[in-house]
């Protein structure tokens, strides 16, 4: 029997309530316990008994990929994983000790694990030694035990001795034979095991011991849990929860598209493949349909087992029945239309004699008592028995990733019509104020603040401690986000009582489930000087940025609040954990640091100064002094608005972090600031509607990095000049006396370079070009620095002068030291600064200039760098979200989008990016208007108002907002909390309407009656006028269209893309059907087309630091060509990510994608397919089914499918990827060219030449547009087209196209290159065939009949091997053939360079040697993967990891 175990749950016993939460079997963690967050994950053992077992998430070992193979195929190209000595981490994951060694071997690369938190104590080396001991202590071999359950076969499982007994419970609740049991204990030798004991603590547990499952008597709580579990099992296949956005369920359609598990499929013969593409996938589709987005919707739901399962109206049991053991009553209607009343007692469940009208709790005759409700229902209903077996089979057939809950809820923007069934448990959940089972934990409600802070206080000195800490932080944070989201929706829906109900509704605050909620309005004129409600609306978002960066710095002793920002139904709600004691006193008494009135009164505190100074080093915040109301200087290490409050628990909290970073002077009109001429010419400064605009952290890091490179270069030049001068003076060869300059530079680098190193990692790509220019200069500075340690010198003045001049040139705050920090209060109104001496870092003028220069750097350097980077089209944005992420990674705020669009507009090769940017700007402008519009809409008319808004946005047809007769009859007054928010919406509504020129005549303070009709006055014309005005006011960009028609014709925007982007941005769910946007007779959207509104949630994302370090080290290895070492490290990263985040997470998906690519490069296509399949499912579930990452995963999977012989599946996957691409951004995109090239090549291989030609023609058109006619993709497209046309017999066209390829290769690569020779040979053959054909045709024309002696024309279809080679080439994977002789030659070359100490040229020479070997047509004895194109993109971000590939082949 195959050995099985389960992956440990993401929450150990770290949090204060984890034990109780586990005991209660919380619904979110178990994903309704049908799939469970746990999954059955075989751990490899020494005799490889599990080689054919399907690995669920590969989080066990470094050999994640190979272990996942179904066929037990031998791993030829990778050293097999060591089967012995597994290090079992504290949560039961098996981890190879080799991974730990890898961390220690790469101590230098991983040292930055603690760079951000020096207070952890000790250097990385010391920590590595400490870890070594701890990890030895963790060594464990696992225990094999037998589990005996009533009515089931003996089950043999392998477990880690570090696991809890509770894990066996979860394992049994996941298995098909035992899933219906919830109330049982586990006994060993008649002694009951403690659920929360580790297995190794059980003295008499040995290899081969048998653990008995013993049914326990029910309590009221256990009976309720059992009924809920049965309900969850029955609706396990129903996608309704995913569409409704509950319980962290989400959709995946990979198995629908591939019609089952790809790994189980046999290879298909090319002639048996149905390859005809659907009409909406072929090139030339104008508006893609919506229905294919959710394939197979009708058959998604499983068979129905029961008509009704609900709690009975006879509940609760009366006193006499309680004394007989009755716990609760259930009511069931079977598929046979039989009605039963069921009693739950301590022994189990039985049918009683009650009816709908009569209460008779006595057992029915004959009585049948079952401990499991499933057994009882199977006994009374044959239909139930059959349906339940079918549901179970289908449940267990699904991939484990389809059953696990996601970390955060993913919402669908389109949904089919869902059947609303009777469900008492759902009804109970909706009206209970708690989450799942949490009301049953000790203390009733959770103390979120205590949990969040306790987890951050956990020890973090060793790897197991850090894993436990990060897992606990992630677990509590995920629960907090879920609770905060639910609470925010309850607040806006009017289900929560305000804590200050007597005040104006927009000033009301709420507490629900120990979370504090406030609305995004300017309460008590706090933001009056900063922009009123506009400032109050954006402040929570900036505050969240502040919380994120302070959490990332992770200073011990400094605490931030749990913060979540939720946008729902047009309102912004901020949810925060509550500081202990804050509600018992006034804010004035609580604050011991900072200011509560924007700088009029300012306080400071020595402990806060100490803590914030530590954080400020990393965040580049300059300590500065301001004057308080008594004109006394007060020192601050943050912005004035940042408040420090010491809670009743003694912790030091900081809050209101909205001005963590310096202001953006390009969007502030200030008296004492004169911008440069270039900026003024570009229209700056632009007066924004609020004064909270600040620069991004990424920009400050890039700016400092840029200045540091300049500093090094300038210092080196001056040193060189000084050096030359001294040498000319002292020709006798004495040591150069000017080396103190190097000492000063050394001091600079010692003080600040460590921080800049971190930034270099973040800005890896950007800095490469600049850093390359300065390598010589840096080498010289380093050489001088080394020399100065050996030579005593006296000429310090000149050396100091060198550094001083370099500092002055780059604008350093200090005269004699490289120092770039920013004062966030430097332009804050009403704050009086203490001005220091000119030339020192406390000089206010210098601080102001520095902030101005950073803002100028954004416009003059970063925006052009962003555009230049995307001109290569190597990783082009696909939608607004990926565009925004790319902008942010360059430190560019979205408010600069108008300026970016102006630059893109002048570049035809950036047409696709221009279109995506315009679409994003329109969506964001519309969002601003929509929020105001929604706040002035009654709850009664929400669906009518939203459908009317969509009609105005997307159509030019009739938009008369007919209020339905049903609603017309509901003449109600001012009911519900929402109405109160609406009616008082003077602030943001009024202010934004004035700013956007709201044409619909609404007045925010209007009476209820007028505001109801307010939304009905909007027309398409008025809405687009508002959008144009908003684009000008907010982004300083002229939107040259006044209707959707002109937007479509002028900018090429697809309406379906606009609908998708807008729905995702504001949280609308529309009905899944085809929409006729051109309809002239009736509105496109009706009331019934608005299915739901969902919250848009912003929160921080906790990081897994050790996994991140593994990943970046692995990337470095891959870039050096060490694929096997890289594979092990990336597997280690995945292992650690599974420890911290559980099975599903975005970063896990990035690791899987990278592992699949590595497996493929190492020649194991089957392994690549297995891993990539998991990556696709994970991306669909975690990112969304139409997310750009999902499209990328699909294209990778199609390549690996083809390599495994699944030709038809490969096409289906590409069709899916192409459909999603066109739906999101249209056909005019560089990625569509790549997908079309792949589709064309596979269709060509299948003999579908006409279809193939359509796709390759489209790809060629796009490649010519975006790459120009002198680019490799264009040459490849011409070649593919020539191949297809030759197979169709059109030799003349083929000849012309191949000539284009040949001329490109000849001009770019030279005549002797292998590709040029291949193309020349192809031309020769085509010419030969063309001549033959022409002769044949001439003969026919001359004689009028066909002669039999003419030689036949041979059209040989390409072999699958040659097609795969071409697919690899298209997708940027080149296998360079090298002989053993060449490898020896390369190695000796590199050794020579090592001896010569010139590492800069090492990689270049190695590459040139390899290329030379390739050009010499060496023997094909060894294949070294080479992906030069993608190497440039290899960043340190997990999301870009798959781009990294090797350019150095020395590891071969």
Curated annotation (Swiss-Prot):
Q: Compositional bias (Low complexity) spans?
A: 8-24, 990-1013
Locations listed in the record? Cytoplasm
Molecular functions per Gene Ontology: mRNA binding; ribosome binding
Residues recorded with modification Phosphoserine: 272
Q: Which UniProt keywords apply?
A: Cytoplasm, Phosphoprotein
Any one Gene Ontology BP term: mitochondrion organization
Q: Where is the composition biased (Basic residues)?
A: 68-77, 970-985
Query: Which CDD domains does the UniProt entry name for this protein?
Result: CLU-central
Q: Where is this region: Disordered?
A: 1-93, 266-288, 726-775, 962-1013, 1414-1452
Traced from the root, the source organism's taxonomic lineage reads: Eukaryota, Metazoa, Ecdysozoa, Arthropoda, Hexapoda
The organism named in the record is Drosophila erecta
Q: Where is the composition biased (Basic and acidic residues)?
A: 750-766, 1423-1433
Name listed for the protein in its UniProt record: Protein clueless
By its UniProt entry, which PROSITE patterns does this protein fall under?
Answer: CLU
What Pfam families does its record include? CLU, CLU_N, eIF3_p135, GSKIP_dom, TPR_10, TPR_12
Which HAMAP family has this protein been placed in?
Answer: CLU (MF_03013)
For this UniProt entry, what's an example GO CC term?
Answer: cytosol
Q: Which domain of life is it from?
A: Eukaryota
Q: What are the Polar residues biased-composition ranges?
A: 42-59
Q: Which gene encodes it?
A: clu
